[in-house]
């Protein structure tokens, strides 16, 4: 993985920072966040500005360029990847480590007095802007909006913004019509005297209107904004895709609807001008709702006295709690996904000993088996197919230069998922096709114990996900080990594979309490640099728990695994498990047999069925 040579790009960018045609006044630093104008985690090629400038293409990271320095902040998932992809012009800032300065503190330490720090106001989230501006201002510096993105100025072959056809989803998939969703949203707006609600997150717009797209690879979303009023709906979207007969019928565009459900379609780039026009007509007490994750440009288009910011929008919270149709769809999707993976692992067991399977060919085979399943649309993220030392790169994606051959001597980790019309999947399994070492088994067993501890947890209603994070780490901590990523994230229903507002992470952030119907992942891991990676990941559904007592009548919750793929018992030090942990695994494997075995039979996949039965034999400790 040769690093990208960035000297000339940095020279051009620094020149733009001083050029009066690009900035009103020279700036001494320029910030390049990861996201797009919608603060998306996964972005279209035209928005990969940070990757273009630095070579680092992980999904999380912020680049800051000054006249003399170029620094990159990223989290523990990407330390190894960033170090390999960036050349020596760059300094890697490892977020979460005690000696790593924050972006603000670093800027204060390196900037000359009275410096101006620039950033594209359409890309930077409002909450980030406020935090950065406050620290810089206190040190005598200024954070300033640069309306023409400077990276775009030097990116001569920047791709066009995608504008692909839309897909409509019926009630069998969504459970609720878009009109009902708008009505529910308006009730929440009325409760707080909100007259307009600005929707900027792409997955929230897709969910609200029961539409899907493919403008961003692996994420079924489309570039758009929406403004919902108490009596008006405005959808900002480009291209003629809204005129497709199925879409027009779905959105009722040709019907003489009552005005409150009539959708006004406007150009995508007119969002700021239209928002300013709406705000000009507000009476003194009227408020406009917007997420504090929305761009600073959108937030600033709303006068401060009328602006009502929130960390999570009502759409974000409603989307996270799956209704019965969405939950049923997610179950169907995970059954199909398990069938594909049983086929894959059976194939790998046969082919790896022959010596011809690589990380890339294994990932391709996983996609091939998934494509055979009904309603398959796309992968849900690039497959992480990694063997041996590549497994220690947490978000590794194989490329020809790094592509290793799977062998009988190394641990193999595959983290993969799919988008089906009825749901989104995300599953990780770690396997050995030969004989694992005692240390590999020991580490795998610690990870498994953590996985079981979360999955089997019973906790009071109202518990936030970060309180469960230590459950996953306890066995690792006992031996002085740990992992540098969160334990779980929310999962969309045929939407983004990562979604808020819930999750399981050691980071203290304003996550919403877990409630029945939410879907998250359970994915502890352990990574030995230069040797191997281990992760066990299931998607789980939050469900009510049956308990002996009910303190203060508050109720309890637990998790139901939706992922039903065998966990390789060869990798387990069974005697290190408790009886309760053995019982959990045996029960889980029995469910795999009952549910996935039946589907494999229905689809006539006999060899994969035989593999499933072999891999789900009960285990027991030697007493």
Curated annotation (Swiss-Prot):
Activity regulation, short description: Inhibited by inositol hexakisphosphate.
EC number(s) recorded for this UniProt protein: 3.4.11.9
First-tier enzyme category under EC: hydrolase
CDD domains assigned: APP
Keyword tRNA-binding included in the entry's annotation: no
Localization of this protein: Cytoplasm
Pfam families in alphabetical order: Creatinase_N, Creatinase_N_2, Peptidase_M24, Peptidase_M24_C
Keywords from the named record: Acetylation, Aminopeptidase, Cytoplasm, Hydrolase, Manganese, Metal-binding, Metalloprotease, Protease
A biological process from GO: bradykinin catabolic process
Binding site for Mn(2+) 2: 426, 489, 523, 537
Tissue: Expressed in all tissues tested, including liver, adrenal decapsular tissue, adrenal capsular tissue, corpus luteum, testis, submandibular gland, thymus, brain, cerebellum and heart. Highest levels in testis.
PROSITE patterns in the record: PROLINE_PEPTIDASE (PS00491)
Main location class: cytoplasm
Free-text cofactor note: Binds 2 manganese ions per subunit.
Co-factor requirement: Mn(2+)
Protein family membership: Belongs to the peptidase M24B family.
PANTHER family: XAA-PRO AMINOPEPTIDASE 1
Name of the molecule in the record: Xaa-Pro aminopeptidase 1
Organism of provenance: Rattus norvegicus (Rat)
